[in-house]
A protein has these predicted regions:
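Terminal amphipathic alpha-helical/low-complexity segments used for targeting or macromolecular assembly
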Residues: 1-213, 387-435
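Glycine-rich hexapeptide-repeat left-handed beta-helix
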Residues: 25, 265-266, 272, 278-435
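Acidic surface patches and DE-rich sequence motifs
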Residues: 121, 219, 240, 298, ...
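Pre-Walker A segment
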Residues: 195-236, 251-252
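Extracellular beta-strand scaffolds
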Residues: 216, 236-237, 245, 251, ...
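All-beta strand scaffolds that present successive hydrophobic residues in beta-strands
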Residues: 217-219, 224-225, 238-240, 245, ...
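Short glycine-rich loop/turn motifs
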Residues: 225-227, 234, 276-278, 284-285
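Membrane-embedded translocation segments of transport machinery
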Residues: 250, 256-262, 268
């Protein structure tokens, strides 16, 4: 099998979710692009500029370690189990297929590429290219030096038409598109459960209810409480390893509950919800993506929203996902960015990594909350909240760097993750550049 190198074409802007995360790291279904290719045994590595290499290497290693621990018994020789070699940042394999991480490229698409061929979308954006030897090495070197990969001369070649099923995303609201979200979840569920060993496939316990004809995949280590309802009328449900669904919770498919995540008693998890690893979720959520390691464990509504890592939403936090006028939602993803039409009547919020919202926080429709925000004001969060805003009823100021880093280190340690020097440097640089 030809290995895959993932790249970010620089054309995406997920607002605060793009501050610390490349496109291959973003959870777009149950998985990220990097996780998909890792589980398929095809990922040789990722490409990025030299300035981001140390932080990207740290996060990639963390992803590899997490998946290796979850699927350690799966033979790497199988096309959908494990990975034969440890992926790296800016590696130089003899031959590889360069894959644009924001496109939903499948293994069969990669295998169909002939040596030297490329695939572009109707707008000319590079989707994938198969290269080897000196040509491939020159591409990796150029990207490490900061050059945009799609413009590299080695990638200008005849391009066949992209497969009809190929979808892509550029903005947060694209990730919540129902048809594309359903498609990604279905593919991810098939990939994930194919990596489980026979002994890891559990069943819905007798004290819970499975309603609907869709599949429920319960990992043998998942804990399902009394009177839990798993409703697959709208699509399948996956309860991944060591997750916990407490008594009388209702989950409506398609939905994914990630490893070691916790769904509180009486919670309602509505369709098209992807809860990444080590999250705590309660209240009512629907059409949401939690990147991972975030808390919304208490009551409150969160809908049509994307939440980064290391986020805490205090008890009673609620968001609006529909304007009183029922009009199309427009968003400004960053303070300096233009207003953009989302094409959606329902659009809640985008919450950046390391954000903390106090109890009772109200989030208005179409709000973008910047990385590292600490919101403890009684007024609603609305519009665009600048990164590293410290907001109280006395006004807004910037988060103090040392205090922010100390809090981040403490929060990450609660989930046995260390804030290493490269990631700390990335956070401090982002804070220093905040307006």
């Amino acid at each position: 099998m030809i290995p895959v190198l993932l790249f970010d074409d620089g054309l995406t802007d997920l607002g605060p979710l793009s501050d610390l995360r490349a496109s291959w790291e973003q959870r777009t279904g149950a998985l990220s692009a990097a996780e998909r290719w890792l589980l398929a045994g095809r990922l040789a590595g990722v490409l990025c500029a030299q300035g981001r290499q140390a932080a990207e290497a740290q996060r990639l290693a963390r992803t590899v370690a997490a998946l290796a621990g979850q699927h350690a018994a799966t033979p790497p020789s199988q096309p959908q189990g494990g990975h034969a070699a440890v992926p790296a940042v800016n590696p130089r394999p003899h031959e590889a297929v360069l894959v644009n991480a924001r496109f939903d490229v499948r293994a069969e698409d990669v295998d169909a590429l002939h040596p030297g061929s490329s695939v572009r979308d109707p707008q000319g954006v590079l989707i994938a290219a198969r290269r080897s030897g000196a040509e491939l090495a020159s591409v990796v070197t150029a990207v490490a030096a900061g050059s945009p990969l799609p413009e590299h001369t080695a990638l200008r070649a005849a391009t066949p038409a992209p497969p009809a099923h190929t979808t892509s995303w550029q903005r947060p609201w694209h990730l919540l598109d129902a048809a594309a979200f359903d498609q990604r979840l279905a593919r991810d569920f098939e990939l994930l459960t194919s990596c489980w060993q026979p002994s890891e496939h559990g069943t819905v316990p007798s004290w819970a209810t499975h309603a609907g004809r869709g599949a429920v995949h319960v990992h043998a280590t998942a804990q399902v409480g009394a009177n839990v309802v798993l409703d697959t009328t709208g699509g399948p449900i996956v309860l991944d390893r060591e997750c916990t669904v407490r008594h009388q919770a209702v989950i409506m498919g398609p939905a994914y509950i990630g490893p070691r995540s916790w769904i509180s008693e009486h919670s309602l998890v509505k369709a098209r919800s992807s809860i990444g690893p080590q999250c705590k979720v309660g209240g009512e959520v629907g059409s949401v993506i939690f990147q991972g390691c975030s808390n919304k464990v208490h009551d409150g509504h969160l809908g049509d929203a994307l939440v980064g890592e290391w986020v805490n939403l205090g008890a009673g936090t609620v968001n609006s996902n529909l304007l009183n006028t029922y009009a199309e939602v427009v968003m400004r993803l960053r303070p300096s960015a233009p207003l953009e039409r989302t094409g959606r009547q329902f659009m809640g919020c985008v919450v950046g990594d390391h954000t903390k919202l106090a109890i009772g926080t109200r989030i208005m429709t179409g709000t973008s909350i910047g990385t590292g925000t600490m919101w403890a004001a009684s007024t609603p969060a609305s519009g665009t909240v600048r990164a590293f805003t410290w907001a109280t009823d006395d006004g807004e100021r910037q988060y103090q760097a040392d205090k922010f880093v100390a809090t981040a280190r403490l929060v990450m340690a609660r989930r046995h993750v260390t804030l290493d020097a490269p990631e700390e440097a990335q956070l401090r640089a982002l804070l220093a550049a905040a307006p």
